[in-house]
Swiss-Prot record:
One cellular-component annotation, GO: cytosol
Stretches that traverse the bilayer: none
Stated name of the protein: Ribose-5-phosphate isomerase A
CDD domains given in the database record: RPI_A (cd01398)
Active site per UniProt: 103 (proton acceptor)
Purpose of the protein: Catalyzes the reversible conversion of ribose-5-phosphate to ribulose 5-phosphate.
Pathway annotation: Carbohydrate degradation; pentose phosphate pathway; D-ribose 5-phosphate from D-ribulose 5-phosphate (non-oxidative stage): step 1/1
GO molecular function (one): ribose-5-phosphate isomerase activity
Its EC number(s): 5.3.1.6
InterPro entries xref list: NagB/RpiA_transferase-like, Ribose5P_isomerase_typA_subgr, Ribose5P_isomerase_type_A
Record lineage: Bacteria, Pseudomonadati, Pseudomonadota, Gammaproteobacteria, Enterobacterales
Keywords carried by this UniProt record: Isomerase
Source species: Escherichia fergusonii (strain ATCC 35469 / DSM 13698 / CCUG 18766 / IAM 14443 / JCM 21226 / LMG 7866 / NBRC 102419 / NCTC 12128 / CDC 0568-73)
Similarity annotation: Belongs to the ribose 5-phosphate isomerase family.
Pfam families per the UniProt record, alphabetical: Rib_5-P_isom_A (PF06026)
Amino acid sequence: MTQDELKKAVGWAALQYVQPGTIVGVGTGSTAAHFIDALGTMKDQIEGAVSSSDASTEKLKSLGITVFDLNDVDSLGIYVDGADEINGHMQMIKGGGAALTREKIIASVAKKFICIADASKQVDILGKFPLPVEVIPMARSAVARQLVKLGGRPEYRQGVITDNGNVILDVHGMEILDPVAMENAINAIPGVVTVGLFANRGADVALIGTAEGVKTIVK
């Protein structure tokens, strides 16, 4: 199976967690896009979705799925999203698609976080994939200096402005042995909006696409 076929398999597998009559939290990226396609087949059974990016909102609406503002939703049963890396503790690096802040906000509200990913995203130690950090533009250089002190090599993601109007620093060369401590340390830097480490709030269920089929891991 190709990588895209594995992504499609886990996207469709996540449908089993969607309860009729509910509002579904939806992530961003190539794997989440497959889940949105699958969700389209249930559009008449669900109330709608809360979206983590303008791109996902557009796709949801094109399939006839109602998109709610998170401020108008009291609770979310599930949030379904991909990951750039996921470790054995269900902690993740996310944000390759620059939607990390909205993703983290929606994940924090959802009762259950379902991570959908192909097997190439599984790692023992997080950090080989560059760690995205969303930053207020005026703080870019100041934040970069602090990230160097934490052992990383930050690189400005040229030409990318997030849906919130901010910039992204991708931090290379990190070996993140304590993801919770690293998430807290980076979030504490003035000017950081959020870091793409999902350690304090990791996934509850991981659906991993493998050549043998979809593997389910429950926290």
